[in-house]
């Protein structure tokens, strides 16, 4: 298995695993709280199941960014415009992957903390929950930079690269709505789900794309 195949399957499987585990099973088996304290209480009430879902869900979520990082890294080359952009994108996605490992992994401390550490756990959950906007901000920037690199390179279907750019721009624009108190939540959810769908579609195009030879490994 080469890096292109591995990254493509990560990009296709990661969003599906994350959606099924966190958006469906978590809501059904653990429950969504209105506050961080309620989230902690729900996890403490279902410690074993919560731990299992965090294990699987975190792997799916982090796999998305590792897949993007591998795709960008395989094209990293400081001697060309597209290679330089790919280098920047690889660093962005590697950083997001590291942050995602941190805040998804923090859930294990909350789950194992029990009721005696409920107050501290609520603070941890509040920080973890508020990390998502930062992740999506840099995810959008990474998509735009990587999409631009791939569009210039022309080794992958332009639909894939343009989708990265388009949805990246949409997420950037959504960050300008922070002052709108009654901004429809459904719009944000549609854009979020769109990011997941775009990732799956891009993974498919990447799998079918022309292989890249960089002297490091086959993309």
Model-derived regions: residue spans:
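Hydrophobic, aromatic-enriched alpha-helical segments typical of multi-pass transmembrane helices
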Residues: 1-219
